[in-house]
Every structure is written in C-alpha cells, then in structure tokens.
C-alpha cells in the first residue's frame, strides 16, 4: 500500500514547521522542496532525526527538483518572500507572483491530482494565480487564511473572557488582510454568541471592537515584534488542520480562501468563506446570513482582492 505523500514547496520557517507537524502526526511521508540548494536537504535530515525520539516513521526528503513531488496527495505552498516590518502583504505582489508561476507549472507537470493549500502572501491573489498557473480544479486549490485569522480572534477572546480557547468558536471572513471581517454575531463561547455575552456584562462593545481590530492587524503585530520575518507556528498549524481534514475525510467546516462562483454575490474570485473540506477537496461552500454591516465589510474586502487581481494581470499578461 502506497504511503500518503505530502509535498511542501518552500523550506523556510513555515515549511520546516509544516514538515515537523506532518511527520510527528504521521500524516504521511514528507518532501520538502526549495530552490536554495542544501536548505531543504538539511532541514529534512535534521527533522528525520526527531523520529527516533518522537516515535514517528514518516520519511522526510529534501529536494531542489520538482520531479520529487510527483504523486503528492497534498501540496502546501509557502514559497516566496515573507513580510518585513513596514511592508504590507500587497507589497509582496510582484515578487511572489513570479514564484507562483514556477510553482504552478511544477505542480501541473508533476502532481496534477494533489489537493493544494497556498499560504504565500498576498494570500487571496496568490491562491488565485496559483490555480490559474497550475490549471487544477478550483475545488482542489485553497488558501490558508481564515483558520489562522479565526485562531487569532479566538485567542484574544479567550483572554478577554478568561475561558478556555477550546470553548471559543470564531468566524473570520473576507480577504487575508486589513479588510478581513471577524463576524462577531457568529462567534461564541460554549455556544453563547458574543453579543449576548456583552449583554451579560462579560465585556463591552468597545473592548470587542478593539479585539476585532487587533485580529485584523494580528499578523502585523507579530512582524513588528520579530523584526526579521513573520509568523510561522500558527500558520503552519492552521494549514495542517486543513490537510488533515482532506486526508482523513473529516469534513471539517473551516474558513478558507475558496473559489466563489456566485456565492455571497461574488464571482471568479478567491475569498475567505466557510467551507467543508473532505476527500473531494472543497466539498461545499457554506453561505451564512450576514448582517448589513458584515455584508458591507465583506464587500470592501472583495473589492480589495479584485484590485490585487487587476495588479496581477498588469504584471503578468498571461493571467488577463
């Protein structure tokens, strides 16, 4: 019986963390790809030596050749330049678009049946471009943003309410950027919606508004503190949750950047919405009723993503 194969494109901080998580969870054998010679090989060797201590038998291989991703069941793409202080996600557009082109062509030639998760920023534009360059079905290419943004929102809410993060369920829609939409009315503690908790005196609207804003700039807060790069532990953990739902056919409801063709009034665009991920990839897009303010915020987010796509088409005419 063939073992499951997970290919990680990009052997930076997120790629290395993904490799460790995938191996330690025994999700499958891991191929770590990078264009820089020696880096993926060194990280794979280092990580494989965790096996005897942690007790995993997953094989790890580092490579600079796309041929080695052949037959991958899941591909997680982190290749590209990370944000530095003062950079917006959109500043990365030109550099990372070129990276997506080579990655997309590598996937198309070697692993056209894979389920692909993109993490590269600016996320909503890069996942769209990666899908275009790879030619894979839309339901097999998604972007990791909402799981991470929702986790950040949940972390801050758990701190505010002094409750376990396990009992906090949050919902973040829209683009992965300053226009994201944390939906307060669908976020709960043990099933109790946040607006009800405000009425119960657990918090105030002003404090929740501040948490929403902190969630929006959650990535930037970490970039400013690290000064040399961006978040990698939580992004990797979030992508692994998505991969696991696909590989184990768990059918988890997760917010992801998914391709919309009419849902939420959006067409031909990747935007963060709740989806069901199972063995067929994105099996269903969950359309929830939004308040007028959430709808308006989502539209702002959609418009921001559209602007990025116009810029992408301006940089690479093959996308037009």
Curated annotation (Swiss-Prot):
EC numbers for this chain: 1.1.1.37
Origin: domain of life: Bacteria
GO biological process: lactate metabolic process; tricarboxylic acid cycle
Keyword tags: NAD, Oxidoreductase, Tricarboxylic acid cycle
Keyword Transmembrane included in the entry's annotation: no
Residues that bind substrate: 83, 89, 121, 152
Catalytic reactions on record: (S)-malate + NAD(+) = oxaloacetate + NADH + H(+)
Record: residues binding NAD(+): 10-15, 34, 96, 119-121
Active site: 176
Molecular function terms, GO-annotated: L-lactate dehydrogenase activity; L-malate dehydrogenase (NAD+) activity
Entry-linked NCBIfam families: MalateDH_bact, PRK06223.1
Biological role: Catalyzes the reversible oxidation of malate to oxaloacetate.
Name of the protein described by the UniProt record: Malate dehydrogenase
Annotated source species: Rhizorhabdus wittichii (strain DSM 6014 / CCUG 31198 / JCM 15750 / NBRC 105917 / EY 4224 / RW1) (Sphingomonas wittichii)
Taxonomic placement: Bacteria, Pseudomonadati, Pseudomonadota, Alphaproteobacteria, Sphingomonadales
């Amino acid at each position: 019986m063939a073992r499951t194969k997970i290919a990680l494109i990009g052997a930076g901080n997120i790629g290395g963390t993904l490799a460790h998580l995938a191996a330690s969870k025994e999700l499958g054998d891991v191929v770590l790809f990078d264009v820089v010679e020696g880096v993926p090989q060194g990280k794979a060797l280092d990580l494989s030596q965790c096996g005897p201590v942690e007790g995993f038998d997953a094989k790890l291989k580092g490579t600079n050749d796309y041929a080695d991703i052949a037959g991958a069941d899941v591909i997680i793409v982190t290749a590209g330049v990370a944000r530095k202080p003062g950079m917006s996600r959109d500043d990365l557009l030109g550099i990372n678009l070129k990276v997506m082109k080579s990655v997309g062509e590598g996937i198309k030639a070697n692993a056209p049946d894979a389920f692909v998760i993109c993490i590269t920023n600016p996320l909503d534009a890069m996942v769209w471009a990666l899908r275009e360059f790879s030619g894979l079905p839309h339901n097999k290419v998604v972007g990791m943003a909402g799981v991470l943004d929702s986790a950040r929102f949940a972390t801050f809410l758990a701190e505010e309410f002094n409750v376990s993060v396990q009992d906090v369920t949050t919902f973040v829609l829209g683009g992965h950027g300053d226009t994201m939409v944390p939906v307060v009315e669908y976020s709960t503690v043990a099933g109790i919606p946040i607006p009800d908790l405000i009425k119960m005196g657990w918090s105030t609207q002003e404090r929740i508004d501040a948490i929403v804003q902190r969630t929006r700039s959650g990535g930037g807060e970490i970039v400013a503190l690290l000064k040399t790069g961006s978040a990698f532990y939580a992004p990797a953990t979030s992508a692994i949750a998505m991969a696991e739902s696909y590989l184990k056919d768990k059918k988890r409801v997760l917010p992801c950047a998914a391709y919309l063709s009419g849902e939420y009034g959006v067409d031909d665009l990747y935007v963060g919405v709740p989806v069901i991920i199972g063995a067929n990839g994105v099996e269903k897009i969950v359309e929830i009723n939004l308040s007028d303010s959430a709808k308006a915020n989502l539209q702002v987010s959609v418009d921001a993503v559209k602007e990025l796509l116009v810029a992408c088409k301006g940089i690479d005419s093959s996308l037009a």
